[in-house]
């Protein structure tokens, strides 16, 4: 029997009792899972298909396979699946802005799948030390220098090592990890999580040299001593307000404040703290100041409450912890009294953005206010440090790069992460590091640049590249399934540390999902278009109960030869007993074909 003949209409096939139209089928496999006789079975994974969540994940994770494994309690397999495209699931599972969830096909039904919490669950329960690594290629004997041990630099180092290159990472700080390790507070991202993932990178043979700042002279030597160089120095400085009084003692940049707390454990604040800014760094600083003993903490944001750039969840947690938020105000001047910080003069901000959506604050200078403060933390953005770079590489406040290859104007030098773009997030830095690794491998081995330039859909895939395909292999995004067919399912939310325990310690606030909750959440995933259409493996075994048609969320995908009113919902067991098989309303006896004579098939 030619099983493929039953996938689509085929005039040459004399008997086609049940068929699946691959143009309509969304490969959700509800039919195969509900089939009582195994007429339909699961098929192989579909090549090139990419779900909406995966298309919007900068790191290129195969989200559907993560939910598939967690659904079955296979947390180690889920962790291995994530690390095939992203070496930092422990970090991303805690602090990623998860754009994947905003594109989830389940949203029209109830709520999107909590893929961010599932990524963390894969790390928490997948025993990180046993997470398998992708196979390493034989050594190329090529040497690569990476400047900066943040998410972009370490990601590039991780995949360059897998691709067979000898990698040395130079980090100015006393620890590796970049922003996640140095600037995100312990209560959001424990140091032990970052350290364990840095150790995984080092386990591939990557030499990470901390306390190794690179100046212009040292950088010039690197370009001579190594076959290629990747610059990933990030944006390690706080931006200045540019107002009178900013140099008053007691005014500190947020990046420096967070670093002092994380590395030196000696950050100090007064009783009345004002944090300038409305982003995640501002909420981190405000919540940290409260934990360090400040009695009053106020955030002053140019943006309105609904346009603040900080994650809504972080704003809500800050307010729960007693942080006050003053929106639509800008700083006019910082005042001192007897040489000490005393207050801030504020002016009303009418709008933080122009009509094109660009950051361009406009003020009503006639509307003013004042706020007392003995500590001011400036969290209005981050700045790069390009003091080491060749002048040919500089483009304003960042390094000039080719957006496809991440090459700089200096041959053999590549750049990525925050230093090469104005779009700054950890997961986008990871994506940049992975793309750089592929581009550098092509440069070092004389490969074809077209694999990076191919017009695929979605993010870069190291797995596809190593398999000999294009770096962006996606070729289609499936239509959204009819979500109502799947039925509602309550989203599982992570447990949170109680308010009193939060503010009196640096313990992690988000406690994550339990194993059971993670499995339950994974089962909410539709796994859109994950596989090729089901195989109708044994068509002559079909009872025509109609369950597959009833369960199918894609009308017209399943076609039956029997008329609807003659589908059989009953079948005789070997004992002679009749039993119901799936239909909500089985047809009356006068409309049922005789048991044992269904399409020429004799039942026991």
Where are these regions (language model features)?
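Mid-to-C-terminal Rossmann-like scaffold of FAD/NAD(P)H-dependent oxidoreductases
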Residues: 11-13, 316, 320-322, 330-340, ...
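Feature captures the FAD/FMN-dependent oxidoreductase FAD-binding
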Residues: 77, 138-139, 143-147, 195-243, ...
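Glycine-rich dinucleotide-binding loop and its adjacent helix/turn
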Residues: 121-138, 196-216, 238-292, 394-411, ...
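N-terminal Rossmann-like FAD-binding beta1-loop-alpha1 element of flavoenzymes
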Residues: 143-168, 282-290
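Rossmann-like dinucleotide-binding cores of NAD(P)H-dependent redox enzymes
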Residues: 166-210, 261, 286-333, 450-466, ...
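FAD-site-proximal beta/loop scaffold in flavoenzymes
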Residues: 247-271, 354-423, 427-430
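A conserved FAD-binding loop/helix module that cradles the flavin
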Residues: 285, 419-447
């Amino acid at each position: 029997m030619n099983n493929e003949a039953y996938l689509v209409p085929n005039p040459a096939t004399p008997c086609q009792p049940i068929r699946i139209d691959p143009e309509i089928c969304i490969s959700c496999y509800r039919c195969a899972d509900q089939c009582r006789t195994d007429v339909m079975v699961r098929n192989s994974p579909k090549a090139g298909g990419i779900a909406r969540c995966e298309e919007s994940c900068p790191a290129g994770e195969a989200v559907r396979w993560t939910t598939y494994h967690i659904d079955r309690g296979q947390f180690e397999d889920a962790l291995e699946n994530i690390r095939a495209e992203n070496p930092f699931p422990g970090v991303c599972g805690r602090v990623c802005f998860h754009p994947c969830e905003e594109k989830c096909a389940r949203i029209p039904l109830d709520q999107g799948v909590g893929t961010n919490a599932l990524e963390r669950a894969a790390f928490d329960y997948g025993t990180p030390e046993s997470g398998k690594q992708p196979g390493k290629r034989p050594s190329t004997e090529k040497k690569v220098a990476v400047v900066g041990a943040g998410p972009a630099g370490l990601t590039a180092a991780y995949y360059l090592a897998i691709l067979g290159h000898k990698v040395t990472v130079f980090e100015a700080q006393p620890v590796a990890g970049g922003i996640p390790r140095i600037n995100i507070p312990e209560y959001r991202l424990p140091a032990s999580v970052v350290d364990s993932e840095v150790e995984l990178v080092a386990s591939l043979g990557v030499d990470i040299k901390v306390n190794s700042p690179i100046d212009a002279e040292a950088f010039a030597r690197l370009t001579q001593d190594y076959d290629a160089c990747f610059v990933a120095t990030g944006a390690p400085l706080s931006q200045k307000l540019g107002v009178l009084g900013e140099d008053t003692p007691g005014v500190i940049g947020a990046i420096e404040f967070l670093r002092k707390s994380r590395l030196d454990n000696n950050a100090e604040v007064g009783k009345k703290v004002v944090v300038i800014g409305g982003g995640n760094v501002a909420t981190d600083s405000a919540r940290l100041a409260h934990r360090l003993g400040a009695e009053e903490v106020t955030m002053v944001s140019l943006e309105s409450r609904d346009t603040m750039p900080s994650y809504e969840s972080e704003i809500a947690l800050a307010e729960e912890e007693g942080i006050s938020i003053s929106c639509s105000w800008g700083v006019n001047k910082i005042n001192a009294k007897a040489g000490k910080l005393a207050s801030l003069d504020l002016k009303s901000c009418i709008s933080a953005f122009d009509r094109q959506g660009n950051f361009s604050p406009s003020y009503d200078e006639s509307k003013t206010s004042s706020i007392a403060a003995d500590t001011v933390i400036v969290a209005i953005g981050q700045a790069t440090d390009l003091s080491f770079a060749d002048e040919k590489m500089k483009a304003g406040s960042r390094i000039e790069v080719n957006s496809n290859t991440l090459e700089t104007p200096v041959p053999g030098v590549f750049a990525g992460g925050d230093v090469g773009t104005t779009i700054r997030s950890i997961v986008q830095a990871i994506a940049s590091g992975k793309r750089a690794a592929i581009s550098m491998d092509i440069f070092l081995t004389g490969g074809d640049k077209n694999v990076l330039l191919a017009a695929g859909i979605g993010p870069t895939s190291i797995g596809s590249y190593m398999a000999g395909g294009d770096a962006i292999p996606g070729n289609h995004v499936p239509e959204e399934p009819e979500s109502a067919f799947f039925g509602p399912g309550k989203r599982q939310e992570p447990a949170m540390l109680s308010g009193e325990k939060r503010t009196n310690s640096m313990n992690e606030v988000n406690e994550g999902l339990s194993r059971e909750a993670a499995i339950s959440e994974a089962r909410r995933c539709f796994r859109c278009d994950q596989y090729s259409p089901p195989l109708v493996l044994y068509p002559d075994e079909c009872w025509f109960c109609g369950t597959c048609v009833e369960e199918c969320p894609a009308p017209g995908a399943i076609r039956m030869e029997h008329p609807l009113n003659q589908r059989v919902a009953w079948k005789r067991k070997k004992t002679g007993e009749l039993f119901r098989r799936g239909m909500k309303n089985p047809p009356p006896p006068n409309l049922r074909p005789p048991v044992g004579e269904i399409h020429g098939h004799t039942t026991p």
